[in-house]
A protein has these predicted regions:
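Short, low-complexity disordered leader/linker segments with a strong preference
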Residues: 1-40, 266-267
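Extended ligand-binding regions for polar small-molecule ligands
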Residues: 24-25, 69-78, 136, 152, ...
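A ligand-binding cleft/hinge motif common to bilobed small-molecule-binding domains
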Residues: 91-92, 109-118, 164-167, 188-189, ...
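Periplasmic-binding protein-like
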Residues: 47, 127-134, 199, 203-245, ...
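Extracytoplasmic small-molecule ligand-binding "clamshell" domains
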Residues: 32-109
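Flexible hinge/capping segments at coil-to-helix
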Residues: 30-31, 135-153
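Short loop->beta-strand "edge-of-pocket" segments that line small-molecule binding or catalytic clefts
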Residues: 42-45, 145-158, 173
């Protein structure tokens, strides 16, 4: 009797282990799906960067718009996928890409050397100039890069603008903030004296904040253009993305996306 019970328990244990092994193999197979086998394409972005990506109420629903989003939709459409958008802090985007939470990142990214160590980049799809936003009342006070010496100047955490602040604004004090609206609020309230941002983005914030303006001096920047990021080694997806970028840039559709995003970002 005891022998029968032992045999039954042993058989149950073997079956449990076998089922666990099968489950593990199925899970691994699902995680290793090729791009063409997946039904969805997941975009990681930080939707506080109009006209690239931003929130807007459309027909009573909070919607993420922008030309990065329009380009991502085009990529998903060409790959016959459903686009899923994940909105997160800019500084966490590349980490989320590398841990597999998203398939690609479009967020006005420029491929600097540090980022190139972490991810692979597409061909550029848009080139923009950098500027410094100041309060209108300070127009005569801040007339050059050097005039910000010993003054606090804001840039988004993890952005190219952080590097610009350190390299081009000698003696200034960098204040890194996670969200651009926080930077604009800090500028309007007098907590910082300037905000470094791309011109197209600056125009959107200035339209909503008439007390602000773009400072009347150039911000030097070696433009590498905005690119899409994918996980290192994901050449399959990168090839799809570069093919779409080449088509929309050559056809002028990219310009149409930018123009539409500028219109959509006007409140």
């Amino acid at each position: 009797m005891k022998l029968k019970k032992f045999a039954a328990l042993l058989l149950a244990a073997v079956m449990t282990l076998s089922m666990a092994a099968c489950t593990k193999e199925e899970g691994q197979a699902g995680g290793g799906e090729k791009e063409e086998e997946k039904d969805q394409l997941v975009l990681g972005t930080s939707a506080d960067f109009a006209p690239y990506e931003f929130h807007k109420m459309v027909d009573g629903k909070d919607t993420i718009l922008g030309f990065d989003v329009a380009l991502a939709k085009k990529i998903a459409e060409e790959m016959d996928k459903e686009l899923v958008i994940k909105d997160m802090d800019f500084n966490s985007l590349l980490n989320e890409l590398n841990n597999g939470s998203v398939d690609f990142v479009a967020a006005g990214l420029s491929p600097d050397e540090e980022r190139k160590k972490q991810v692979d980049f597409s061909d550029p799809y848009y080139f923009g100039e950098q500027c410094c936003i100041i309060r209108k009342e300070d127009a005569e006070k801040y007339t050059s890069l050097e005039s910000f010496k010993d003054q606090q100047i804001a840039a988004q955490t993890g952005s190219i603008q952080e590097g610009i602040a350190k390299e081009q604004f000698p003696g200034s004090v960098l204040v890194s903030l996670p969200k651009l609206p926080d930077e604009i609020m800090s500028l309007s309230s007098g907590k910082v004296e300037g905000v470094i941002v791309e011109v197209a983005v600056a125009n959107g914030f200035i339209a909503q904040n008439p007390d602000l303006m773009i400072a009347d001096f150039e911000v030097p920047y070696d433009a590498t253009g905005s690119c899409i990021a994918v996980k290192k080694g994901n050449t399959e997806l990168l090839d799809h993305i570069n093919s779409v970028i080449a088509d929309v840039v050559a056809s002028g559709e990219m310009d149409e996306m930018v123009n539409q995003a500028n219109l959509d970002s006007e409140y």
